[in-house]
Amino acid sequence: MTSDQNKAAVKKLVEGLGTNGSSSAFDVLHEDAVWTVMADANTFPVSGDMSRPAFIAHMRGFHESLPDGIHVSVTRVIADESNASVEATSNALLANGNTLNQVYHFAFELTGGKVVRAREYIDTARALSAFSR
């Protein structure tokens, strides 16, 4: 795939992590995709590798826990024929009444326009603070 096609694919996927995104966003994930949250499992409850089905189930559960959903905005995309990098922000009202304003970086590996590997970097301190206050 071309860099522009890969940019469009990962933008659709990342926007689809929000409840404001396309319902077909997860179609961008290859059936054997692995999604890794790059965080320390000893300090952050969502970390490590997830298969495509596990990641989709995790996101659906997360969406259901949010009273007003979550809005994800892509702020920058860089891509070539097999890799893409995405910066994004999100905001959501949590069930505990706190607001989560998060920043992300995603590194993707693509084959044939499908994401085969995703690495998600988030501000874990910001997330822990919002969920625990």
Q: Where do the PLM segments sit?
A:
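Short beta-strand edge/turn micro-motifs at domain boundaries
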Residues: F106-S129
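Short beta-strand segments enriched in hydrophobic/aromatic residues
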Residues: L29, S90-A92, F106, I122
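Short, low-complexity N-terminal intrinsically disordered segments enriched in polar/charged residues
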Residues: M1-V28, S132-R133
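A short hydrophobic beta-strand element
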Residues: E81-S90
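Short, surface-exposed coil-to-beta transition loops
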Residues: H71-S73, E87, L100-H105
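Short, solvent-exposed coil/turn segments at beta-strand boundaries
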Residues: L29-D32, D80-S82, F108-V115
